[in-house]
Every structure is written in structure tokens, then in C-alpha cells.
Curated annotation (Swiss-Prot):
The keyword Kinase does not apply. HAMAP family: SerC_aminotrans_5. Belongs to the class-V pyridoxal-phosphate-dependent aminotransferase family. SerC subfamily. Its main location: cytoplasm. Pyridoxal 5'-phosphate binds at residues 80-81, 104, 150, 172, 195, 247-248. Its cofactor is pyridoxal 5'-phosphate. GO terms for biological process: glycine biosynthetic process, by transamination of glyoxylate; L-serine biosynthetic process; pyridoxine biosynthetic process. This is Phosphoserine aminotransferase. It catalyses: O-phospho-L-serine + 2-oxoglutarate = 3-phosphooxypyruvate + L-glutamate; 4-(phosphooxy)-L-threonine + 2-oxoglutarate = (R)-3-hydroxy-2-oxo-4-phosphooxybutanoate + L-glutamate. SUPFAM superfamilies: PLP-dependent transferases (SSF53383).
Length: 376
């Protein structure tokens, strides 16, 4: 067994969870599960106790995102991964266009490409660590990209590209929703999972959908296209408007999510959450730029994520050793995305994470580097 150095106490964060999903959960969210353990958990999801939680989540998210008139919060099971498949059945009419700039933004493009009932999608790519600009695609009735690419820490703004009239804008906000600025009216489907900024468990997808998106879903559902019921977006819409899900949800996840949304809204709403992630990301990137051995992986500062920070280290430093030393001291999940294969750390900076803890994390890395503990 390798002996790792013990970090000085001043460099130990108040909470050592820096993972990019699942992410840090606040104690109050766990207490919400305890409080609902007899009255909500273990009861029917078709009855008021659970339906009221779903309704509270939908109302809270509507407030958080300042939903325009006619938009609805829709939810169903399976996470964003299930939503990609559902979108190929029930959102894309004929053809989609995609921005692909990392592991997760590429997966929706792949799902569309594999769907034999759709035309070949157009895909614009960028090297990992960079991101293409939003753009229209000729003949595409859905334009899709990620607000935040979780694998690389690159973010792309949410806007309606010039010339995109008639196309639905579908934004994968899995790791960005709740921590990045957004004007929802610039998207038609802004979908996400709760295990990132919302500090809950996975297995659920939620989406802010525009009237145009709801109309498209209804139109496709009324066609002769085969749609599996579990992936039927119209089924998700119909159940969501009743504050239900098609099949049984993980009720503890709903309780955690509801508590987090209430916390967000009572602490400044989306602007307050973006202020928190901005403070954390500024602390991380400023440190990396000042440190000779380190540098932000995303070269363009405007594209650097506020919620997922990726930091490269030069060849003289073994970033994997840094992560191991941090883990041995209770600072968890700073390893890079597994498929990226880079000499780097990846740091979650979601709203529940305090910027003071990010500052302590950088101090811990300074201690490791200055002590020569991670030299190759």
C-alpha cells in the first residue's frame, strides 16, 4: 500500500466532494428524505403525497428559469441518455443538426445517426477542449448541442442561430442547468438530469419545453411512427401535466431535487447560483493560470465552463498521483473523464459547492506540487 502525504488541515475543504455527477449533496437534502420517509416514501406515486412533490418541483423550476408563457416543465425516467432516444422517436421529425465537441454531445448525434426512420444528421465537430459556434443546418427540424460538455469542461451559449426559423433548438443542459446563465426563450427543449447542479440522484430527465416543442411532440405522436411507450414524449407530457410520471419514479430523488430547487430559489434564484459557480470557477482558473505547471484545458476563456473545470498539468507532473493524494485525504472525484486520457484533473463546481472549498482545494494542490509529491 502506498503511503500518501497528509495535507495540512488548512487545505482540507469543509466538504471534499468535487465530482462532476453524482455531485455534492447538501445535508438538508438528506434530511428531506428522512422527513418524507413515513409520509411520502413508500406511498403511491399516483396519490397526492408524491404528486405534490412533483408539482412543487415543476413550479420551482418554472420560477428558477423564469419560464415564458406556454412553456412547461416535463419529466420522465431514464436520465438524459433515455431522452436522446426519446427525441429520435418523438422530437425529430425528419432530420437533425448537431454540435459535437465531447463524449456527451456526440451521443445524441450518434443516436440520431442510428435511427433508420430519420435522415442522416449533419454534425459539426470541434476538438475536445474547444466547441463550435451554434449554427443553423439546412433542412434540420431540430438543432442540438450541449450547454456544457461534462467530459471536457467546454460550454456553449444558448441562442437561436441565424437562419434557424422553423427548427427546434434542443439543449442538453445535463451539467449546466441551474449553474449557467440561460434565457429559456432561446431554446425549445432545455433538458437535464438532477445529479449535477441539482445535487440529487440520477435516473430522471426534466425539460423546459416551448409551445412549439409540445406541438411537434403531439404531431409526431399522431403519425404512424412506432414509438415505444417508455420513450413516448407525449406520454411524458400527459403525465407531467398531472404531476406524475409514466412509471414509478425514485421518490427519494424527487425529495432531494425538490429541496435543492427550493434552496436555489431562496438564495437568489438562477442569478444567485451563477454567482456561486462564477466565484468557484474564477478561483480555479485564476489559480491554474498563475501556476507554472498547470493550465486550463479549455484555451478560450469564454468557453471555460463555470461548473466543470478541467486543468492540464505539464509532463513533469503526474496528475493521477495528485488525485490519489487528494482522495487519500478525503478530497474526492477529481480524476479526469476516463475516455479523455489526459494528464489533468476535473473539478465539479456546481452551486452546492462553496467557492471557499475550491480555494482550499487549490491550496492542497499547491502543497502537493511544492512538496514534489507528484513529480514523475
Amino acid at each position: 500500500m502506498t503511503d500518501f502525504p497528509t495535507l495540512p488541515s488548512e487545505f482540507i475543504p469543509g466538504d471534499g466532494r468535487f465530482g462532476c455527477g453524482p455531485s455534492k449533496v447538501r445535508p438538508e437534502q438528506i434530511q428531506a428524505i428522512v422527513d418524507g420517509s413515513a409520509s411520502v416514501i413508500g406511498t403511491s406515486h399516483r396519490q397526492p403525497a408524491v404528486k405534490n412533490v412533483v408539482g412543487s418541483i415543476r413550479e420551482g423550476l418554472s420560477d428558477l428559469f423564469s419560464l415564458p408563457e406556454g412553456y412547461e416543465i416535463i419529466l420522465s425516467l431514464g436520465g438524459a441518455t433515455a431522452f436522446w432516444d426519446a427525441a429520435t422517436f418523438g422530437l425529430i421529425e425528419k432530420k437533425s443538426g448537431h454540435l459535437s465537441f465531447g463524449e456527451f454531445s456526440s451521443k445524441f448525434a450518434k443516436a440520431s445517426k442510428l435511427a433508420p426512420w430519420l435522415y442522416e444528421p449533419e454534425i459539426v465537430t470541434a476538438e475536445t477542449g474547444d466547441a463550435p459556434a451554434p449554427q443553423a443546418f439546412e433542412g434540420a427540424d431540430v438543432i442540438a448541442w450541449a450547454h456544457n460538455e461534462t467530459s471536457t469542461g467546454a460550454m456553449v451559449p444558448v441562442l437561436r442561430p441565424e437562419g434557424s426559423e422553423g427548427s427546434l433548438v434542443a439543449i442538453d443542459a445535463t451539467s449546466g442547468a441551474g449553474g449557467l446563465p440561460v434565457d429559456i426563450k432561446n431554446s425549445d427543449v432545455y433538458y437535464f438530469s438532477p445529479q449535477k447542479c441539482f445535487a440529487s440522484d440520477g435516473g430522471l430527465w426534466l425539460a423546459a419545453m416551448s409551445p412549439a416543442a409540445l406541438e411537434r411532440i403531439e404531431k409526431i405522436n399522431a403519425s404512424d411512427r412506432f414509438i415505444p411507450e417508455f420513450l413516448n414524449l407525449q406520454t411524458a407530457v400527459d403525465n407531467s401535466l398531472k404531476n406524475q410520471t409514466y412509471n414509478t419514479p425514485a421518490v427519494a430523488t424527487l425529495l432531494m431535487l425538490d429541496n435543492q430547487v427550493k434552496w436555489m430559489n431562496s438564495n437568489g434564484g438562477l442569478d444567485g447560483m451563477v454567482a456561486r459557480t462564477t466565484a468557484s470557477s474564477s478561483a480555479l482558473y485564476n489559480w491554474a493560470e498563475a501556476r507554472e505547471e498547470a493550465s486550463p484545458y479549455v484555451a478560450d476563456a469564454a468557453k471555460r465552463s463555470l461548473v466543470v473545470g478541467t486543468i492540464d498539468f505539464d509532463d513533469s507532473i503526474d496528475a493521477a498521483v495528485i488525485a490519489k493524494i487528494l482522495r487519500a485525504n478525503g478530497i474526492l472525484d477529481t480524476e479526469p473523464y476516463r475516455k479523455l486520457g489526459r494528464n489533468q484533473l476535473r473539478i465539479g463546481m456546481f452551486p452546492a459547492i462553496d467557492s471557499t472549498d475550491v480555494e482550499k482545494l487549490t491550496g492542497a494542490i499547491d502543497f502537493i506540487l511544492d512538496g514534489g509529491f507528484a513529480k514523475k
